[in-house]
Amino acid sequence: LRRLHRGEPVPTGLIPIGGLLGIGFALAPDDGRDLVMVVSVNGHGLFDTVTGEKIARDRDPDPDPDPDPDGSIPDAVPDLSCPGLGPIASARVRIAGLFGGGLHTTTEDGWTLEVVSPEWPHDRVLLSADGGIPHNGPHGENWWHIFDSNYSELRAAGFSPSGHTLAVATSSDETLWSHQAPDIKRSAGQFGRSPADWGAQSQLV
């Protein structure tokens, strides 16, 4: 993992998710770690946010031609949710992306995520520890430009409810960063006050 600007995490590779529509978070029932549900034109997938491991996959979810509160397609139900897979099959996951919804933009320990578009239609994602715009100090001190969607449409950006995972999803890929949870062994990232404390974990297919 290369790091720039006092530890800013920089993704080291790109693995596409063709036709990504949206993402949502859930908690693993066994140890409470963050999981991410990915919805695309090629089906639904559930991934570990730390390792990038694909935990479960549904390549052909029910298309739900009629509105159904228990439907499989997020835009077909009022709360933009879809059924969970694998270990969270008994739950529904709210999805943020092309059809609406949103992820958390702040964490309890003071991180803020913002999306700005100075070169519209391209979006930029900013991570800060100073409460957000207007930023206090120069770039690289208390705020960082961590992502530029100049190659694909931004679908969603934000934190998991736990605050342990940061995700940026576009129409072609997803990038995850992870905090160190005290009770979960992680491969990178520790709590702290600079992006060095967010390890860029994976870009999922």
Predicted features, each with a name:
Residues 1-205:
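WD40-repeat beta-propeller superdomains and closely related acidic/aromatic-rich repeat-like regions
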